Structures are given as C-alpha cells and as structure tokens.
Regions:
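N-terminal acidic leader/helix
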Residues: 2-28
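Short, charge-rich amphipathic interface segments used for partner binding and complex assembly
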Residues: 29-64
Length: 65
C-alpha cells in the first residue's frame, strides 16, 4: 500500500489525538497516557511517516502534555 501524503497523515494523527482527549474527558476510566504511548509505539513509530518530535508537537496541539 502506498503511503499517504504527510499533510494528510498529520491531519489523521491530530484528529485521532483530539478524539483520545475527548474520550478522556468523558470516560474517567480511560487512560490517556497509556493509550497515547500505545498509539505511538504500535502505529506512528512503525509507519515512520512523522518523527517523534512531530508527534509530540501534535500531542501538545491536541491538549496532551
């Protein structure tokens, strides 16, 4: 499968992170930290479309500190 362009990929990642933040606000049992780490390790890192620094910046933009 071909890689999608970087701008689209970043948009998808940002939307996913924002959705995770929304879920954390509505579900007190949801572990945002663990899910963010899992998302990075199992999806972002293997796909190698963005760097760790870019991912961390998107986390900040989504409200994950």
């Amino acid at each position: 499968m071909d890689k999608i362009d970087k701008k689209t990929y970043i948009g998808i990642v940002k939307f996913t992170l924002e959705s995770m933040v929304d879920l954390a606000k509505s579900d007190k049992n949801y572990d945002l930290t663990a899910d963010t780490i899992h998302y990075y390790e199992k999806t972002i890192k293997p796909e190698m479309q963005i760097s760790q620094d870019e991912f961390l910046e998107l986390c900040k933009e989504a409200g994950i500190k």
